[in-house]
């Protein structure tokens, strides 16, 4: 914990799921947490029963489970026009420059095993809502294509039922935003950043 008077967590996507699970298992480790597009569920264009069947089958075959999940693959620079992460052309190009300068930062698509573990982590988050009363701000992207916004809504509903609602009682929706809220256009990004700073200040 260290000598600091106050401790805060700011986490995004899978980092949000991991941070939430951490606080459910180890109480009172921070004074407040702000989450942007936490991965409590994954957008997959197939029925849940089919996804589970495929993932459970893949889990039993090591070569398959460690391979890229369907529809994904090695890292490649996608044209800005088809990206589903940000509307900011400038920030998107900056990220591509980072990857060009440091190829080791490039991360390809998820493996079958990673997808399965991600889904299980989201389920654990929802099951453990009653174990954490840390003040929580959950920020949601309106035009989300990566994580399942329905799970954000469910998480906030469960927290409210457990007696420690999310800030505002529901997710703070950033209108028009894609998944990478803090890499978005300034107009959207500033709404999220201001909300985070104000939230942390209230718990200072």
Model-derived segments and spans:
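Short beta-strand/loop motif that positions the catalytic acidic residue
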Residues: 132, 138-140, 144
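Catalytic active-site module of serine/aspartate enzymes centered on a nucleophile-bearing elbow/loop
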Residues: 170, 174-204
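Alpha/beta-hydrolase fold nucleophile elbow
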Residues: 2-13
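Alpha/beta-hydrolase-fold enzymes
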Residues: 14, 19-106
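Conserved alpha/beta-hydrolase "nucleophile elbow" surrounding the catalytic nucleophile
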Residues: 11-16, 141
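Active-site nucleophile elbow and catalytic-triad environment of alpha/beta-hydrolase enzymes
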Residues: 109-128
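Short alpha-helix in the alpha/beta-hydrolase fold that links the catalytic acid
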Residues: 134, 148-158
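Core-facing hydrophobic residues within beta-strands of well-ordered domains
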Residues: 4, 29-30, 168
